[in-house]
Amino acid sequence: MKTSEIMASLQAKYPGEKEYLQAVQEVLESVEEVYNQHPEFEKAKIVERMVEPDRIFTFRVTWVDDKGEVQTNTGYRVQFNSAIGPYKGGLRFHRAVTPSMLKFLGFEQTFKNALTTLPMGGAKGGPDSDPLGKSDDEIMRFCQAFMLELWQCIGPDQDIPAGDVGVGGREIGYLYGMYKKLAREYNTGVLTGKGATWGGSILRPEATGYGALYFTQNLLHKAGKDIKGCKVVVSGFGNVAWGACKKATELGAKVVAISGPDGVCEIPDGITKEMIDYMLVMRASNRNMVEDMAEAFPDKAHFIAGKKSWSVKCDIALPCAFQNELSLEDAKELKANGCWCCCEVSNMGCQPDAIHFFQHNGVYFAPGKAVNAGGVATSGLEMTQNASHISWSGKEVDEKLHFIMDSIHEACVKYGTQPDGTIDYVKGANIAGFMKVATAMLEQGTI
């Protein structure tokens, strides 16, 4: 297998799908050497099959807004790979959603889910619309219209969606309510991220952020460092950033900045519990403005319009917002501001040249598919609880999450340790996930 040849073919076939092509290239470059040591993979054309989704559903979403006007959006569900389990991946409600974005996310999800060691395949979906600016009634009607089409291609043993950007507990509730009515059955295993009183898992909202900090803590311990006292900067203020801030503070780190589309909120003395709680209020407001934090806590926070968290002096950077949010220029600014560790919490949050800069300039770097796997891992634990008709305590879920993140870190170290003793976490994560999926595909035949 030659990465250059496969990429040339994909670029000719999908010329405008930048995110998808970027994700595929990163994985293929990491696994090429190992792949070529397995002629059985080449004979079965594993890579050529793995880079194409099993299927993509595209459908119209028609709903009525509060003014009585009919609105039309496009919805998608990309079922990428089910070699190791039923399709599993979130629903992203965002106006920038495209097939390319969802293919990239579904491809990444395939390897992320494999890293958890839980039996879950990869998928992703969503519409080209988001909750911002919509009333609660409009969000409910939109979710119902979306599920009116989606329900035909999901199921507890087939495809289990969850939340993602723009989809939290409220949206999952509306989606499940419509699914229940259409399917005429009460089967909570069809969605994860549900409310704790009706089949959801305790700690699911915090899980991605918590898991990211457990992985970061493992990385630092491996490097002979301690997270206590470290200054941390975070991008975003949604569920992922909230969970990351909460766990970072609990572990003794000091979160000194969070950011939004409007700018950065500096918190010199570190974020407090009250401020972390207020992040949920900010997200629920649908204003999408981090300046609200500075207005609510004027003595503790300072807002700077148009700036990013990367402009603040720190030890550790946690991109928690969106794909490709951290550029080469941002990476250089972080390094100049004292940053020596960057762990992606968003999916593909760093651009390729930013990752290259980190890896060649003394900055520890770990990729999103490993760092943020705690979210889907806890979704997997929710699936287990639903299937077994049991409910675990928060402590039990947290212990299982911590164990899974420890195992993911160990897999990255196993496959990513270089001859000079350094650890390439990108290569380690990609090879570990790839080998599990590739082996399953090989053993299941040419399908």
Where are these regions (language model features)?
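Glycine-rich phosphate/diphosphate-binding loop of Rossmann-like nucleotide-binding domains
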Residues: G195, G200-K313
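Adenosine-phosphate binding glycine-rich loop
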Residues: K2-A23, L219, K335-I447
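N-terminal cap/recognition module
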Residues: E69-T110
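Structured beta-strand/loop patches that form or line metal/cofactor-binding pockets in enzymes
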Residues: E40-E69
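Rossmann-like adenosine-cofactor binding region
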Residues: G263-F365, A370
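Flexible, glycine/charged-enriched surface loops at secondary-structure junctions
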Residues: L21, Q37-A44, T117, I154-G163, ...
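Glycine/serine-rich phosphate-binding loop and adjoining beta1-alpha1 elements at the start
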Residues: H94, N113-K228
